[in-house]
Amino acid sequence: WFGFGFFLSGLWWVGAAFLVEAESFAWLLPVGVLVFPAGLALFWAFGAALARLLWSDGWARLFAFAAAMTLAEWLRGTILTGFPWNAFGYSLAAQPLTMQLASVIGIWGLTLLAYLVFGAPVLFLGGLVSDRRSRLLSLAVIILMLLGAIGYGALRLNGAGGATVADVRLRLVQPALDQREKWQPGAAESIM
């Protein structure tokens, strides 16, 4: 259910596309808004089931969960031409310092790091890791990974100049277009 709720909240906007020509397509709205997120949630169900198979006692459980869920996200982004929309790693890509690591490990590496960082509090809950030393060591490893990502981001951004690149033409497109106007040949000039 968590996966369904996650994808439902991240894909609610898909339903708006069925309302452009509502007389023809509104009947498909439940498919886009309910069935599509439910199908995507199956990938997370697979990841959770795989994590359960890899379960072990102690801190390794968090790493098994993070690896299994990252694999599930990668499969979702790859199978049947893929749909990597709203991958968990995008939560780290919202910050310029942490997003720089994507240049090295990509979105799937950021996804693994996000699962580890955001899952770290579980090390202190429910007696998962009873040995205080192991708990602190595993938390230190995760914190060092995050600090390493931030440090790399700071170095990379510090080295980025604001230089102008010659012979580059940049075209900005207004994304908030009425869908009926979008394909009208006479609207091309105002859109572009």
Residue ranges and their predicted role:
Residues 1-159:
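Membrane-embedded alpha-helical bundles of multi-pass enzymes
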